[in-house]
Amino acid sequence: MCAKPESVSASRERCCWPDEVQATNRNRTSRALQSGAAVFDVRSDLVRVRVPAFWARSAVWLFLGAMFFVGSAAAQESKKGDLGGLSLEDLAKMKVESVYGASKFLQQASDAPTSVTVVTAEEIQKYDYRTLADVLRGVRGFYVIYDRNYTYVGVRGFSRPGDYNARILFLLDGHRVNDNIYDGAYVGSEFPVDMDLIERIEIIRGPHSSAYGAGAFVAVINVITKRGRDLRANEVSTEAGSWNSYKGRVTYGDRFDSGLETLLSGSLYNSQGHKNLFFPEFNSPAANNGIAADADGDQAYSGFADIIYRDFNIHFVQNSRTKHIPTASFDTVFNDPRTETTDARGYLDVQYRHLFGAWETLGRASYDWYDYHGIYVMDYAGLGIPPYTENYDAANGSWLDFQGDASRVLAKRHKVTLGTEFRQDLRQHQLNYDIQPYSLYLDDHRTAWMAAFYLQDEYVIRKRLAFVAGLRSDWHKKYETTLSPRLGIVFQAGANTDLKGTYSWAFRAPNSFETFYSVSISNTANPLLKPERIRSWELEAAHRFGKTYHFSAAGFLNRIDDLIDPGIDPVTGNPIYLNSAPIQNKGIEWELGGKCANGLEGLISHTLQASRSIATGDVLTNSPKQTAKVNLSIPLVQRKFFASADAQYISRRRTVAQTDLGGYAVVNLTFFSRKLTEKFDISGGLYNIFDKQYAESGGLEHQETSIPQDGRSFRIKLTYRPHLSAR
């Protein structure tokens, strides 16, 4: 009956003022969100001051500029002593960024034949990133949409409604995170591992089906976790934040003399969410005057185990998250806190890595599972009078995956990588029924399989010039053989200048939800869907100014054919997924950054793009023409106490209702103290410090064309290490 809800981020409590203030400002707030009227609101309990947009934007840049000069002064004071205090490991991290996910072997990011950003554990700490979504908000070309249930990620102006991040391949230590029902991957509080366990995040732009097959459509994000040797300690973390949000984590990690290495961790999260959320679309006495009360809660838990012994590595991951839905999506009853979704994801992964002569090999076998269920409170009679009907929607998947990779250098100039993969979908079950009175709408069971072989050759033509060619062939139970090629060139024009060019094809096969989900009073299945395909061209130039500053610029052009998009079935009038007309996505982006030895670092980036239907010329929905990011981190006390700020600007977007949604700028301010005492770290953040009112575009399942987002919020976190290993 109900298609599974879409996107995630948090929201702003709008009903915390006296009643007379609420009544006069609701319509004004709604119009501001829809039109993009840029008004910042500075509030107290009794006073509301309207600040013009120009002044607000100026304040943002003046604030960041002031921080830069403060940081520069602090940097000059401590410049002489800082380098001497750095460990060899710290110096190594400053000089070289390595990436594995771009080519399935470890290489310098500058040598990868594609555009790569690496976010380190230190950056996660400095900017107090709470979720993977927070990280991606600060990355060039990425933007995040939250519909108060799930979080969606857009890349370079491309994000489609009804897409549970299915066009981005998410990896956890090289293991595919996307499930086998929706191809979904989740980046909010439902991400499988705690942010404190992450060593680095590799963000690889562009299609990569030549190495990974279906789903590596517009980007690959590979999250690398820490190992036991990185902790050598017990660790306890606790945090508290706005809206009665609390989280706790217990972690143990160590490496033993026998060579055994372990990392074990568990965490719990609970947030009551906003006590009251106002939605003008439901502003009537029958719907509590548009106020959703106590309907924004979020609860999650996760467990993680990493065991390494000699050439073997075992990963175990389990995560579950329940989110209450305040938006009355899918025509559910407004202001009923029983409407909620639960997503659970886990896997057991066994790896064997060994050097056979000159061949570096990796074998992997894994068993994965995914469980989703939702309760949707429905008013089928449309009278607004209880009792209402609880509709139960569920999806359960399990699958086996086997992979083998091998790489070596041949004839001194060829770095050859070859591999194979086989996946057996043991279970793809979708279920929907009314609980009382019982009425079954859907009970669909499927199985599937996929096999693939791929080959890549990195040919060093001469010292500073390399040519990369890759090809993967995928065989799918339902679809014909698909070939995914990639050609790339990497040229070092000088000691500090790199030029890259890439041409690649990629595809995404229709998932089980898009193809087989059918409920007579809701969705229509479409077993005739074809895989969608993308052809991509990209050029990038990067230059390093000494050891401190770097600049990069890129241009990209993508053509997408047979795009799988939600539409309306002309026969039933119900939603249905269809292959749509070709899409063109093109643009340019640049980034300027600096990182000093004393810890002062900053980054500014901008993306300008245009995404349109080739057939009609219509602008794509949820596609901001411009995104801009600013990050700045300042060491205030000899690399032990940092103050950081980051800002994101998103321009006007077109909603699914074909209305325009105004742009916005949000600024966050955070701090991090490493070893406040010998055993304590403390960090915290003030998010959306100017309390900006803004909204994101909802999907077709929402009556709201825009979903209000969080205003000002805070978090503070304390980490304690009661025992440090002497090894």
Put a short name on every predicted segment.
Residues V96-V116, A133-R176:
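Extracytoplasmic beta-strand/coil segments of soluble accessory domains associated
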Residues L132-V135, Y152-G157, I168-D173, G188-F191, ...:
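N-terminal periplasmic accessory domains that precede
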Residues R176-R205:
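Short acidic/polar hinge/loop motifs at secondary-structure boundaries
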Residues S209-S210, D230-L231, E239, T251-E340, ...:
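Periplasmic-side early beta-strands and strand-to-turn transitions of outer-membrane beta-barrels
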Residues G253, Y301-G303, T341, R353-L355, ...:
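Conserved C-terminal beta-signal and adjacent last beta-strands/turns
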Residues D306-T322, T342-Y479, Q492-G494, Y549-F556, ...:
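Face-selective signature of the C-terminal outer-membrane beta-barrel domain
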Residues V333-L355, A395, L442-A448, N496-D498, ...:
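Outer-membrane beta-barrel signature, preferentially recognizing the C-terminal barrel domain
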Residues V460-F467, S552-I560, L578-T655, T719-Y720:
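Gram-negative outer-membrane beta-barrel transporters
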